[in-house]
Amino acid sequence: MKKRKQKRNRKLWWRISTSIVKLTKKKPKWVFEGEEFCEQSLILCNHVGTKCPLTIEYYFPYNFRFWGVHEMTEGWRSMCRYLQNVFFPVRKRWKKKLPCKIVGFLGTPFTAYIYAGLDIIPTYQDFRFMASVKQSIDVLKKNESIIIFPEDSSNGYQDELPKFNAGFTTLAAKALREGMDLPIYTMYYQKKKHRFIVAKPIKYSELVSKGWSKDEISEFLCQECNRLGKYE
């Protein structure tokens, strides 16, 4: 994949931190079925815990912003509760409560440091979601990209994604009305092989032209992501 051409739009202390961390990390392999990434795009990817988002942060070639749950952006107390009650017991599927409580508590300061550096766009399950969309549109207008992990992880992170939450289609539809026909890249991180498989991008207008509903578009792209996960 092409080297980064842009100065990362992150705070100086975070850029320094990631530059140091990258010295100890192995670069992932990127496999493209079509064109490589471009500016002002929408990227959908599986989550795979914390390793996938951080690997993207280190090596993605263009400026972008992540979407993330609002509970992780509302202070240490909210973050700690989310780690203890959702991330470890539900997303990571830890069975015992005590380790979830201890690791969630001890991990909050480090996680807060990371989230402050990532500058995540918070997302919501209610009317406040439209504020997330508006903020994302402002980012796209700067020729930056949005990276989303839309998988339904209510039963934990899984290799075979059960479904995509369709919120990203609201963003894509709003962007189209604003004159931005976003190329959508579906991407799958294969953790054991430390590589990203990236499907050929498809414009949102092409998906709409098929007469599909937002749920049908979401289902199609979820299946595309699962297909990439089986890539040999």
What does each model-identified segment do?
Residues 27-32, 52-53, 108, 133-134:
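A generic local structural motif
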Residues 1-13:
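Helix-enriched interaction subdomains in cytosolic or periplasmic regions
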Residues 25-26, 119-120, 230:
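Short aromatic/hydrophobic-glycine micro-motifs
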Residues 38-125:
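Catalytic core of membrane glycerolipid acyltransferases/transacylases, capturing the structured
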Residues 2-4, 125-232:
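Non-catalytic C-terminal accessory region of glycerolipid acyltransferases
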